[in-house]
Every structure is written in C-alpha cells, then in structure tokens.
Amino acid sequence: MTIPEKPQGVIWTDAQWQSIYATGQDVLVAAAAGSGKTAVLVERIIQKILRDGIDVDRLLVVTFTNLSAREMKHRVDQRIQEASIADPANAHLKNQRIKIHQAQISTLHSFCLKLIQQHYDVLNIDPNFRTSSEAENILLLEQTIDEVIEQHYDILDPAFIELTEQLSSDRSDDQFRMIIKQLYFFSVANPNPKNWLDQLVTPYEEEAQQAQLIQLLTDLSKVFITAAYDALNKAYDLFSMMDSVDKHLAVIEDERRLMGRVLEGGFIDIPYLTGHEFGARLPNVTAKIKEANEMMVDALEDAKLQYKKYKSLIDKVKSDYFSREADDLKADMQQLAPRVKYLARIVKDVMSEFNRKKRSKNILDFSDYEHFALQILTNEDGSPSEIAESYRQHFQEILVDEYQDTNRVQEKILSCIKTGDEHNGNLFMVGDVKQSIYKFRQADPSLFIEKYQRFTIDGDGTGRRIDLSQNFRSRKEVLSTTNYIFKHMMDEQVGEVKYDEAAQLYYGAPYDESDHPVNLKVLVEADQEHSDLTGSEQEAHFIVEQVKDILEHQKVYDMKTGSYRSATYKDIVILERSFGQARNLQQAFKNEDIPFHVNSREGYFEQTEVRLVLSFLRAIDNPLQDIYLVGLMRSVIYQFKEDELAQIRILSPNDDYFYQSIVNYINDEAADAILVDKLKMFLSDIQSYQQYSKDHPVYQLIDKFYNDHYVIQYFSGLIGGRGRRANLYGLFNKAIEFENSSFRGLYQFIRFIDELIERGKDFGEENVVGPNDNVVRMMTIHSSKGLEFPFVIYSGLSKDFNKRDLKQPVILNQQFGLGMDYFDVDKEMAFPSLASVAYRAVAEKELVSEEMRLVYVALTRAKEQLYLIGRVKNDKSLLELEQLSISGEHIAVNERLTSPNPFHLIYSILSKHQSASIPDDLKFEKDIAQIEDSSRPNVNISIVYFEDVSTETILDNDEYRSVNQLETMQNGNEDVKAQIKHQLDYRYPYVNDTKKPSKQSVSELKRQYETEESGTSYERVRQYRIGFSTYERPKFLSEQGKRKANEIGTLMHTVMQHLPFKKERISEVELHQYIDGLIDKHIIEADAKKDIRMDEIMTFINSELYSIIAEAEQVYRELPFVVNQALVDQLPQGDEDVSIIQGMIDLIFVKDGVHYFVDYKTDAFNRRRGMTDEEIGTQLKNKYKIQMKYYQNTLQTILNKEVKGYLYFFKFGTLQL
C-alpha cells in the first residue's frame, strides 16, 4: 500500500508521516532520542482504527514495561473518545470504546501469560497455576542447583572431578554454583535452551571453529599491532630530529624490521610474533643527550613515550591474545571438551529438575511464560502450530516498542504470529539501538542491527527502514555536542553501529536563540596533604556547587509561553552509572540543606532500621550468633550499655557464645541485681518471640515486634522519618510476599535475605518522594531512560568500567557460547584457552560498546543544559588525553577498546576540538568552520582545582532518645457536648509562637537566613533533609586506624581550646610537651598525636593573631552563652520572640578595653584557577557573615559594649571582620 501524501500544515515531519502510514511490509523505525516515537506509535494505531477501519483488538501492541503499556492504552483510549465525540454517529468508533478494554496492548510477558491461560491444555499443566515471586524463584533455583551438584558428587565422573577442581575452592562450591546459574539464565534466553547448551562443546571439538577463533584473534590483534607500528614510527621520526641518539635509532630500526616482518603482505604473521622477542630496552637518555637537544626537551619526552606505547601494545597482543602457540591452544581445547560437555549436562539437569519442582508446586516464572508460549505456537519441527495460524489470522498488525531490547526467544514468538516475510509482512518495530543498554537482561541488540543493515529506505525487496532523527527535546547545543562526541567515538567496530548522518540528532524543538553551551567540568583532586576528603567526596562537594550555581543563575524556558522562569530543585537531575556515589552526595547535599533524593535500588539492607529488624529476626532464629544478639541488646530497643556487656563477658570470658555468658551471669550470685533483672527480661522476650515464631508466619512476628516496642513510631520521629517508616513497612510487605510462596518459616526467610545480600541484590530504599516533589534527584542512567530534565549533571565519568566479569574463569556469550580457561589438574595451574581468550576479547568489545550507549542515553536526557563532570588526580593526564591517537574520523580503535572510563574518550574528543597546541595529525578537523552546524560542538571546558580544609561537624554526646520514653495516650471519658464544643472552638492566643523553636543554635539560624535570602522556604528545606544523622564513632574505632575528617576537626579544636598564649611564643618543642600533657591528662586519646596537624598549629602560634591574644588583658576559652533572640535581633516591642539562642564561642579576649571574639573554622572550598587570596577571603567572609553577626550582636547584648571579631582558618589564616 502506498503512503498517502502529506497535507500542508500537519505537525508531523516527513519521516514521522512515513512511520505512521508505511504498510505492506515489515517496517523498522530507528527512532533517535527525543524524536517522538511514542506519539508516532499512538498515531499509527489511531490511523489503523480511523482510516483503515481495523478493530483495536485486532492489533497486538508490545511494550517493554507494564507502565508503558498502561500509558499507551490510555492515550489510544483518549484519542478514540475524542474521535467518537467528534463523530457520534460512527458505530465503528463506539465499538472501539468497548473493545479497547480487550485490546492487546501489553508487555510480551503479559501476552504470553494470556496465551497460556487460554491454551493450558496443550501444555498439560494445571490451569490454576500462579506466578512465583522473586523470593520463591531464587530459593527454588538455589535449592535445585545444590541438589543436582550433590547427585553428581555421588556419580564422581572424571570430567566432573576436573570441573570441581577447576571451578571450586577448598572451602566452597560458590563459584561453580554461580557459573551454573549464569549458564542457566543464558540458555533460557534462547528458543531452544538445551540445543544451545549442546552446542557449547562444538568449538572445543571441531578444528574448523578453532580456526575461526584464531582468525578472530588475528583480526583483533591487527588493530593493536598496527597502532604499535604507528607509535614505533613516530618514535623513530622524533629521534631522527635529534643529535647524539644513534644508539636509540639503532634499537628502533631493529624493532621496525621485526614489525615489518610481522605485517608483511598485509597479514599478521602470528607464529613469527610469538616466536620472537619484541620491545628491546631503549638506552638511557643521558645528561649529554639532553644538553645536545636542549631546545627539544618536549620532543624527547614524546619520543620516549611513543616507544613505551609501542612496547605496551605489543605486550598486550602477546600476553592477552597469543601468550601460547596456536597448536598448544588447539590441544588445550581438546582437553577441555569433556569438561564443557559435562558442564552443559549439569545445567540441563538443573533445568529439568527446576522445571519439575515448579510443576509440582504449580508455579510459573517469566522464563516459563516465554517458553510455554513458544511451545503453544510451534510444532515439534519448529514450524508454526494451528494456534499460531489462528493468531496470524486474527492480528492484522503487530507493533513492537523498544525493539532493540528484545531477545531471541521473544523474536521467535513474534515470528510465529506475524504474517508473511520481511518484504510483505505485518511487523512494525520501533527502537533505537544506540539506547540498547540491557544486555545484562539478555537483550540482544544484534537483532535490531541485522534488520537495520538489511532493510532499505525504499523497502525494495525486503523490509522498509525509516530513520526518525529530529529531536524535539533538547537545545541545539546539547544535540550538536552529542553528535560531535559520537561521530568520533562510535562506529561498527566499537559501538556496534555507525554514527553517521542517518544516526545523528537534528534540532527540532522551538527554543529561543540564546546560547547555552554544554559544560565539561574537570575537577583536579586535592591530595591527602591538602584535603581530608577522598576524591569521590571532593566530587560530591563540587556537584553541590554546580547545583547551587544553577539555582542562583539559570532559568528554564517555557516553550508554550516563550518565557523564562527560575530553576527549581526538581529541574535538576544527577545521573551516574551506578549508586556508588549516592552516600557521598547525600551527605554533601545535607550539609548545604538542599533537598535531595536518591531512588536507589541499593542500600536498603544497610539502613539502620532494617538492620535492627534483621538482627532481631536472626537472634530469634539462632541466639548463638553473637553479632546479631549483641547488636539487638545495644539497640534502642533494649539499651544495654558497653559497661554492662563488659561485665557479662568478664565473668565468663571463655564461653563460645555470648548467650552462654548471659545465662552464666544470671546464675552468678555476685552479679549486679539490676543488670540480672534486665537480662532476665531480655531472655524472656527472646524465648517469647521464639515460641511465637513457631506458630505464626514471619510477617506477624515482625508486626508483633513493631507493636511491642513502638518501632514504627520511634523511627518515624527521626530525621528522614518518612523514608525510615516506608523501609520498615517494605520489609513487612516482603515478608508477606515471602509467606505467599511455597516456602515458609523464619529460617527460610533469613536464608532468602542472605542470598540477596550475598549476590548484591537489593530491594532498594522505599520511595517516599513523588515525581512532582521539589527535590534534586539522583538516578542511574538505566532508570533515567525515557525521561527528560531541564538540567542534567552527568557525573562519575572518571569511574572505571566494571570489567570484573572479564576476569572470571568462564566467559559467556549469547552468540559464541562458553569460553573456559584451561586448568592443568596435575600442575594445578590455569591458562587462558583459545575460546576464553577469544570470547573475553569479544565480551570486552561488547562491554565498551554498551558503555558508549549508556553515555548516549545520559547526554540525551538534557533539555536545557548539560553538565559533564570528570575528575583526575593531576592535570598532566589531561595532556595525554588531548594527544590520544586518531584513525580517520574516530579515536583509534585500540584506544577505544582499552578506554578505562567515559571521561577518557569524552575529554579527548572535546579537548582536541579546542586545543591549539596539538599537531594536526591528532586533530579531527583542521578548520572548525568546516564542521556542519548539526555536529559543531558548543562546549565550555573548565579545569577546577579542589582545595579543602576539613568540614566542621558538631557532635552531641548528650542527646539520647528511647522508645521506652513514649507515653501511652489515654482517652478521656468526657461526653458533655458543650464542653467538647468549647474545647474544639478554643483558639490558642499565642499560636504564632508555637511555630518558633524554643531554642536554636547559631548554625541553625545561619541556615535559616541563608535560605530566606535565596527565596527558599526554610521549612520546606528542613522537610527534605536527608535522614542520615552524624553519630560519633565508637571509641574503639576512634582509637584504631585512621580518624575521619570530622574527628580530626574536633581534635584540633580541643588542642586549641587548651593552647597556652605566651608573649615570647611557644616553641615547637614546647608544643609537643603541651600535647603530651593533654594525653597524660586524658583530654585527648593516646594515639591522637599523629593526627594533630603540628605545622598548622605552629603557623597559628607564629601569626600576628596569636601575638595579639598573648598580650591581651583577659582571655576566655570555649565560652557558652544563652540569650533571648528578641534582644539580639532588637525586635520592636510587641514582637517579642520566645526563642532563645544557644551557642559556644571558641575564644574571647579583651585588649585596650575592647572585647574580641575568635572563631576557629574548618571549611571546604574550591580554588578555581587564578583565584587570589583576597577573593577567597571575601568568599569565606560571606559564607559566615550571618553566623559572625549573631556572635557579635549576642556579645554586645550581654556586655553592652562594642565587640569585634576574627575568623581563623587553619590552612588559610586570619580574617578580621
């Protein structure tokens, strides 16, 4: 059928119009990010109904998630209703409003489930089956693997013995079990899992396939050998320009001859490469050589660097790809064949037994959905069944969203119910292979790529391909910079798809013409000498500064009104590859009182409230586990003190278990009676809960614990109470879900939790923040897919790719199979095998390709502005990245394949564009003006140097709260209506004062006034402060190992508090004696001296401020104060404030009748390049001006005299206010 002509004035682009109306053959729509694919998909469905008269239930629409399916169905229903209202006499539209409820708009799993429910008789299964929960499936599969391994231990086949010796350790079979599990999940992602498993051994037995693997490695090694040869020639060219380097040139000449032999005829001579030594040592560069080439020092260093690069590339090829002769590699494959075959047999046994167990329990999992559906739709020979033919007749079109994320089982299911071949089929597929980021879920992007390469724009002879490239989301600066990065980063070799004109993004959004460049921020870490913060913590602080800058200076454009509004918290998202940085960000945002939310799938089991409940459950299950028993005793529930625990243990120090020590203490006549009563009550509780757990499900046990000890109420009252409460209810709900499975009991529930923790799975902290809540969000790139935000901060760019799987003894790949290292049982030595080397190389290439696609997803989330945050140890590494090798229009293949992280590539590409110092052969273009507008980058690159003095943390040892202090509220028995009405109508005359805190610290007032100055509601800010309190570390942790930054800050304050002031100044020797005295008096810990910054204190002693204080008439240290805030703020009469201000001033001195206060400060700040001390001083003064003003006003109120003040920063110096 031909595509109708597009009328004038329609909103659709030409490509969108074709996507809506193309028919008569299979259609693949390559929809780039922000190109409106969902709108196109909905419009196509609507036009099928309105224009072609097709009933909505005759269309099968497959989405990736249930949420997408619901949204799609809602949109279609809405459009049908609108059309029906416009044409009320249309009977066809009226029918669609009824049929929409039966429409097949769902995930493929939902479609499969419906298929099974309708045709369960074909499968010979009980129709009353249910879907297994995650908990049940995990436990059942683990149980099955354990049982199957035990069965094979009974058989003790020689191949099995060799497998266990290779893949198990002396202590456990954990690695062996993990490999079996991975193989199971890989296999069931194929239409015929057992056939896939049977084929794993083929490369180990057939020489033809082994030859293919050697060729694969040869082709890959050619990339690195060619790059090595280029580096060697560059070294030669550079040395040729110099004097007195004949010996160096002679070595390089020999290497060039060897390399010429390896590359002779354009082929790689692998036997010659492995049979000869390469990379001879280069003679030292002597002082005489440097003197002779004093004008070419940089070139000399570059020549050495190029030769070093040559050696490393050759070493990589020889060690990673051809560490052994080809014949030896083939021989190893023969030795491994029986082991691989036996491993496949074990996995098939697991598969069969796992299926048997599921059938006996009458449960199905998601894998069963797909394979049972396939069983219904195919005959034994693989051809479509009669049922499949009926579905082919029924569905007039099949529409698949997110096609790039399908696997081969799902592809087979779709092929069974579609009609025709590609040239005359009815399959409509939408997706973007550049956003295929779910390989860990067995998604297979090659399915999309194969069709993309096979289909044509005009659709002649095969399927039709349509490229949706116009982006309606982002500003042109975001798009052009993204295009430029990927034009030089992604191709078929690395990235699996060519980023050409068809793939790139074209501007289509109606923004104004103002300039909003992409910002690439490079943070140069401060070393340990200049900062107590780790590199990750420094980056977190830096990100907060970017957020503050956005809130203060940036606006958001409204496309509908054509006007700007101020940026708010919810306009900003921080994207990271994983949640590894979440804790640092939470703390950094908390320090600045910026509302911040992480919807993490990690960290749930680390939450204090969850750990408490799990300790309780473990102690009830087995009180002989000391960690959990003592943890429960020390918790807020039972509140045993350290001294009490010590008393118990001292009485019987040789007991194996602490529980025994408790029993022995209770029975000891000399024991403390009060402690004995407390212990008896505790043990009574334990025994009572144990008895309760025998007769009740886990969720009821948890509920009883919550109610008995007011657990929900207690944690709800802490900072972050909403989230803590949600976490507690989340654990309760998980217990309910667990009890609904076929497993029962406390032991099984704990085992399930342990399995999740051990394998790194997590429930994630419960989400208590809605999509419209005004908070800064952090999310992973995966969870951001499909979303958009005005401001995107893409951070963590310098975090290395996770290549842990590449180091495993077994490498799995859907296309190639299984690569197992060779293990010599007699010598107990492991070697890379031909298969493991080849598949490891393939896996690394696929991993880097997927990481590139993740970068693409991250960059294309930004609507208005994009911030890229990288971090380096020193700025010298940036020069190396600028000089990264290129090949044609791309960063060289070897550089991309070995790239450690995204920053490595992004900075190299963008810095080359801006650099004026690198030679032309390292640039992509000689003239920037030659770049087309659509891919001309608009980016600001800034390098920021982090300088820091430890942030100050005030710890309160006196605050202690207990659930036992909660009082039970008593209901009154008053029933006189008049009295009730009088009480309900009563209005408290001082209601405004109730909204004011009775006591505030100066720091709290500082935060309040800062947020008021910025136009932010302070109460709103406080409401969203992250729920992580700062508690002092236990003494035994503080006394051992490295102190944290806040502990060092407290230590420095303690030293300054007692520091003597002498007119002649104290010497360094006297300072050491003074600190030894503090240790002797137990004012500071014995091991504290190593953490005291002596040089900084000596700097203070030698300062002018020290001299002024030493000559003062009076000196007061650590002076506490409490004063009425109304007096300090000088409020008018009638506006008195009931609040009081409480604080502590580090030091006050009196000189010449004038009172001065001194506040010692520790702080973190960014010293940007070129920043003067005066500018930093102004910055720090502004930061503390509110706090210092309160100190000044407070002292003037108390003393009724003029007061002046100083700030002293340990690493910066004195600032007078």
UniProtKB/Swiss-Prot annotation:
Domain UvrD-like helicase C-terminal: 476-786
CDD domains per record: DEXQc_UvrD
Similarity annotation: Belongs to the helicase family. AddA subfamily.
Domain UvrD-like helicase ATP-binding: 10-475
Enzyme Commission number(s) from the entry: 3.1.-.-, 5.6.2.4
SUBUNIT field: Heterodimer of AddA and AddB/RexB.
Protein name per Swiss-Prot or TrEMBL: ATP-dependent helicase/nuclease subunit A
Annotated gene: addA
UniProt source species: Staphylococcus aureus (strain USA300 / TCH1516)
Keyword Cytoplasm applies: no
Keywords carried by this UniProt record: ATP-binding, DNA damage, DNA repair, DNA-binding, Exonuclease, Helicase, Hydrolase, Isomerase, Nuclease, Nucleotide-binding
Sample GO molecular function, one term: ATP hydrolysis activity
GO biological process, any: double-strand break repair via homologous recombination
Catalysed reaction equations from the record: Couples ATP hydrolysis with the unwinding of duplex DNA by translocating in the 3'-5' direction; ATP + H2O = ADP + phosphate + H(+)
Record function comment: The heterodimer acts as both an ATP-dependent DNA helicase and an ATP-dependent, dual-direction single-stranded exonuclease. Recognizes the chi site generating a DNA molecule suitable for the initiation of homologous recombination. The AddA nuclease domain is required for chi fragment generation; this subunit has the helicase and 3' -> 5' nuclease activities.
Cofactor or coenzyme needed: Mg(2+)
GO cellular component annotations of the record: cytosol; DNA helicase complex
